Amino acid sequence: MKIYLVGGAVRDALLGLPVKDRDWVVVGSTPQEMLDAGYQQIGRDFPVFLHPQTHEEYALARTERKSGSGYTGFTCYAAPDVTLEDDLKRRDLTINALAQDDNGEIIDPYNGLGDLQNRLLRHVSPAFGEDPLRVLRVARFAARYAHLGFRIADETLALMREMTHAGELEHLTPERVWKETESALTTRNPQVFFQVLRDCGALRVLFPEIDALFGVPAPAKWHPEIDTGIHTLMTLSMAAMLSPQVDVRFATLCHDLGKGLTPPELWPRHHGHGPAGVKLVEQLCQRLRVPNEIRDLARLVAEFHDLIHTFPMLNPKTIVKLFDSIDAWRKPQRVEQLALTSEADVRGRTGFESADYPQGRWLREAWEVAQSVPTKAVVEAGFKGVEIREELTRRRIAAVASWKEQRCPKPE
């Protein structure tokens, strides 16, 4: 029996990145031998075991053979005669097909070290094309390591295109697509994930609402980048700089979906695109089974981001109504989330990357003023039933009006 550290732990250590999880491959052993040594078996379809002390995963070396469609249609073979090289060959990328023995020596049968040095994401073997989930995984790795200068090898991107055009991605379940997307949204450069999907044709298959934005022009005065698809990825990049929250990043990604519905004869104007985009947000989220809280914020951002841009022109009643509409009294975090997504929208434009966004400050200040109006004082004043709500709203409007007169510039 020989044990090797494999995969991401080896890769990230070589890149000088923190190692989070360690996975091990056991060569020359059997399930019974592992059980006799005190390991606990957890794998149903293939033999994976938990170490009795560290609880890290130890898998018997195995090979996989395509036996059906999609990413689950594989037959696994695990036996003492499966070599380390056999096991590493079934992995997706060469940089993930590295192993380290107990002396610290790196085993690299597929030139993963060279690809690490050259910052290349390259598939190990043609078997890559048998698993459609790998298209999303490579896009996610491209996003995760973009800041280190990694790019996808030409032949790997070509294979990803072939897989997409062959209809392989249609076998992916919504849950897996969302899981990979959610993970990509946590990276430093989530926009790279969607750009890679577009480059291989997968964006049109998995995110047609976003793909439809490419080629749709916006007024050059407000959008020097012109293309709405490019603007969308720029805003996502900006959102990633402003917030680590997946819901903020996803909502920013979806903020302009309504522009994809504008008839070409009305281009480059997109009047009413915000409310129009709400149905597309709902459609996308329902298809991918996006969690409700993330979906709800994306709907609100699509509907109200343009309203927040015009904040100085809003009257106090409209401002308080906005807080009602986003359910800010019960979910106050949404005020900050809308401020961040709206700022990402403004700064996600060519030449505006460092622009100030005072509307965000005014929105936050107005919220502090409105929510500081005490409900208790209204009750103590003798108001009852629906009168409490009505009087509370009236006092909030008055408080915002007083603040706006002093703090918010009047529209020209």
UniProtKB/Swiss-Prot annotation:
**InterPro entries linked:** CCA_bact, HD/PDEase_dom, HD_domain, NT_sf, PolA_pol_head_dom, PolyA_RNA-bd, tRNA_CCA-adding_enzyme
Which residue ranges does the record assign to the HD domain? 228-329
Q: What does the entry list as the binding residues for Mg(2+)?
A: 21, 23
Known CDD domains for this protein?
Answer: HDc (cd00077), NT_ClassII-CCAase (cd05398)
Superkingdom assignment: Bacteria
What function does this protein fulfil?
A: Catalyzes the addition and repair of the essential 3'-terminal CCA sequence in tRNAs without using a nucleic acid template. Adds these three nucleotides in the order of C, C, and A to the tRNA nucleotide-73, using CTP and ATP as substrates and producing inorganic pyrophosphate. tRNA 3'-terminal CCA addition is required both for tRNA processing and repair. Also involved in tRNA surveillance by mediating tandem CCA addition to generate a CCACCA at the 3' terminus of unstable tRNAs. While stable tRNAs receive only 3'-terminal CCA, unstable tRNAs are marked with CCACCA and rapidly degraded.
| Family per record | Belongs to the tRNA nucleotidyltransferase/poly(A) polymerase family. Bacterial CCA-adding enzyme type 1 subfamily.
Record-given protein name: Multifunctional CCA protein
Protein source organism: Escherichia coli O7:K1 (strain IAI39 / ExPEC)
**This protein's encoding gene:** cca
